[in-house]
Amino acid sequence: MRIERLYEVVRAPHISEKSTLAAEERNEVVFKVAVDARKAEIRQAVEQLFDVKVRDVRTVKMKGKRKRFGRLEGKRPDWKKAYVTLEEGNEIDFLGGAE
């Protein structure tokens, strides 16, 4: 896979209370990924970008929220997130040990 596609597939880490608990309890990392990305592509991208071994990938398509600005109504775009379970002994630290 080309390096450009790797960065298109894995867009950003998704940091939330739920994803932090998943990282601590189940060695899972949550990413925002491209809507057209397949599980095999996500696995390959994470393994190559972060130099870790992936055990499992689960994906969820998220609906964009409806938003209003005065009388104008709009909708945020739909997006996809991936729960990536890492093999034992592998970890990705996005916060750099910040307390």
Curated annotation (Swiss-Prot):
From the UniProt annotation, give the residues forming the signal peptide: none
Q: Which residues cross the membrane?
A: none
A GO term from the CC aspect:
ribosome
What job does this protein perform? One of the early assembly proteins it binds 23S rRNA. One of the proteins that surrounds the polypeptide exit tunnel on the outside of the ribosome. Forms the main docking site for trigger factor binding to the ribosome.
Q: Which SUPFAM superfamilies match?
A: Ribosomal proteins S24e, L23 and L15e
Top-rank taxon of the source lineage equals: Bacteria
Q: Name one Pfam family in it.
A: Ribosomal_L23
Q: What name appears for this protein in its UniProt entry?
A: Large ribosomal subunit protein uL23
Q: Which family does it belong to?
A: Belongs to the universal ribosomal protein uL23 family.
Per its record, what are the GO molecular function terms? rRNA binding; structural constituent of ribosome
